[in-house]
Design a protein with these regions (language model features):
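Short, non-transmembrane amphipathic alpha-helical segments
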Residues: 515-536
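Short secondary-structure junctions
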Residues: 484-490, 530-535
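N-terminal glycine-rich anion-binding loops that anchor highly charged ligand groups
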Residues: 48-63
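Helical "lid/coupling" subdomains associated with nucleotide-phosphate turnover
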Residues: 5-8, 27, 41, 66-97, ...
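Non-catalytic pre-domain segments flanking phosphatase-related domains
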Residues: 1-26
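A short amphipathic beta-strand at an alpha->beta junction
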Residues: 532-550
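N-terminal basic/disordered segments at the start of proteins
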Residues: 21-52
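A generic, well-ordered mixed alpha/beta core segment in the N-terminal half of proteins
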Residues: 155-169
């Protein structure tokens, strides 16, 4: 795999630096696009083969605003970019990164003076940004999305609408089947075809036809690579998709700060486009989550997204907040041997991100694993008799068990509430927004009060989510109650449900141990079971293993 960029340290930078924690590595990635310059700084954990973002910066540099006659980058655009990149370099060095990797995309690819400008940046700023092809851009976008989304066994169509080009990828958890790039983007369309606004209907129809003609080769290529009967999931990344998600989220009664994983239907997009088209740029800039620069290019971006969905025959897309710049981080990790197999990396994304958050907040890993093991065993033993949930909910229970005590990182008092906040506002890659909310709520209600209508954590849940939390949070209470000491003391347990009575028998590791602490903790859960679901809880010791009981029966 070829190197995307190398970095040169500038010894003249004297900003105060922050060093990474022992065993951690830091790397910065720069995405020099047609519309914006992006910087991310990542903390890489070699042990877990994962990374978390320490900082994300964006500057609207509009490098794609080229001279109409010569096609060259304008002096104004180059100066905006110089200032932004100098800021990026100083931020990266102040965070103690060991390397800055960076790429330049369509604006630099096409401008006659693009390479000369890159040479100047290397000389003056010590940044070696590499111009990449549209196909390489698509590959890096794929890696970025792959790092933050669970592909499971389904193919995914990834659409990234940039300023100068639009990348369309067909991929699954095994390979990128098709990597395409079309020379149609929000800034390019605005520059070439939008002279006055609001657009007349005739101009809108022209733009749709132009976009369709530009995208059709890419769409044909990806659709040919789909096997008969396959139903792909569509993922949309970058500015236009995030703007759509922000606008729809602002209208929602249950808005969330994080847009990653939000699902948007074609009907919602079509209705939004019709509301946006009559607005002026000034009116668009007044919309929630839309700044002045995004407002200028919002309409072309929306038309690209709408046309792509129609051509692909998709009725919904999922928003990803990871794209090219995160792909640069993954690519750096691959090249440095920190990810041996990117497909194994993908298959474990959920488990890895939970472990990453647990380590971040100082969770006792041994105890968390024991609680998670107890919780899953309780889930399996109570299926059908107490609940009818499947493997998806089982995995959410595991994640909540692993992270239930992360709130201790803030304070021991009311730590379950702190756990809810940290989980709900954290970065759980591979989990959807709704799944993350369920995990947080399970952790919130593993102790103390049962859910109440006035609780914010309860108001955010829909009916199905509440059913999951009501039942599985009770199982998590039992799992936590069975692990109150630094070391394991329970060998195994058996749970039997008769009528509305739950009988729980514990087998101690040490036959002489009466497990008084654990039994006391379990008995304290009885009121929650009685008030929460109408079950009576009875706990006792046994000296016979479950396998021996079955043989005797």
């Amino acid at each position: 795999m070829r190197e995307c960029a190398t970095a040169l340290r500038d010894p003249a930078v004297t900003a105060q630096t922050t060093s990474p924690k022992e065993g951690m590595r830091r790397v910065a990635a720069i995405d020099l696009g047609t519309n914006s310059t992006h910087l991310v700084i990542a903390a890489v954990d070699p042990l877990l083969c994962s990374f978390s973002l320490l900082l994300a910066e964006k500057s609207t540099t509009r490098l794609g605003e080229r001279d109409a006659d010569s096609g060259e980058l304008t002096p104004q655009a180059m100066e905006r970019t110089r200032l932004a990149l100098r800021h990026c370099r100083e931020l990266a060095h102040s965070h103690g990164v060991e390397e800055i990797v960076g790429v330049a995309t369509s604006a630099m690819r096409e401008a006659p003076n693009g390479l000369a400008f890159l040479a100047e940046l290397r000389e003056t700023l010590g940044l070696n940004l590499e111009v990449i092809s549209g196909t390489e851009e698509a590959r890096l976008i794929y890696l970025g999305v792959l790092s933050g989304m669970d592909f499971a066994d389904r193919p995914h169509l990834i659409l990234d609408i940039g300023g100068g080009s639009t990348e369309l990828v067909l991929a699954d958890a095994q390979e990128a089947r098709a990597l395409t790039s079309a020379r149609v983007g929000a800034v390019r369309l605005q520059r070439d075809f939008v002279k006055s606004e609001p657009l007349e209907r005739e101009r809108v129809n022209f733009l749709r036809a132009f976009i369709q003609g530009s995208l059709e080769p890419s769409v044909d290529k990806v659709l040919r690579r789909l096997a008969p009967g396959e139903t792909p999931t569509m993922v949309a990344t970058s500015g236009t998709a995030m703007a759509v998600a922000a606008l729809l989220e602002a209208e929602s009664s249950r808005s969330s700060a994080r847009l990653h994983g939000k699902k948007v239907s074609k009907a919602e997009l079509d209705a939004l486009v019709e509301r946006i088209l009559p607005l002026t740029p000034l009116q668009r800039a007044a919309l929630p989550g839309i700044n002045e620069r995004r407002a200028e290019i919002l309409v072309p971006g929306l038309l690209v997204l709408q046309t792509a969905m129609a051509l692909l025959g998709m009725d919904q897309f999922v928003v990803s907040d990871r794209a090219l710049r995160e792909g640069l981080i993954v690519d750096w990790m691959l090249r440095h041997g920190l990810i041996v197999d990117r497909f194994a990396y993908q298959s474990e994304i959920r488990q890895r991100t939970v472990w990453h958050q647990a380590r971040k907040f100082g969770v006792d890993g041994g105890r968390a694993e024991r609680v998670a093991s107890h919780a899953l065993e309780l889930f399996d033993q109570t299926k059908a008799g107490f609940h009818n949930f499947g493997p998806e909910q089982r995995e959410l229970l595991w994640a909540a068990a692993m992270l239930h005590s992360c709130g201790l990182h803030i304070n021991t008092s009311g730590y379950h509430k702190h756990s809810w906040y940290l989980i709900n506002n954290g970065e759980l890659l591979g989990y959807s927004q709704s799944e993350q909310l369920v995990i947080a709520s399970l952790a919130r209600y593993h102790r103390r009060s049962l859910p109440k209508k006035r609780h914010e954590s309860w108001l955010l849940l829909d009916r199905e989510q509440r059913q999951v939390v009501e039942s599985l949070s009770l199982l998590l209470r039992l799992a936590v109650a069975m692990d109150r000491r630094p070391e394991a003391v329970i060998d195994s347990f058996q749970l039997v449900i008769n009528d509305r009575v739950i009988n729980l028998q514990l087998l101690p590791l040490n036959p002489t141990d009466d497990l008084s602490l654990e039994l006391w903790s379990l008995e304290s859960c009885a009121a929650a079971f009685r008030d929460g679901c109408g079950y009576n809880l009875c706990c006792s010791l046994t000296t016979i293993r479950v396998s021996e009981q079955l043989q005797a029966a």
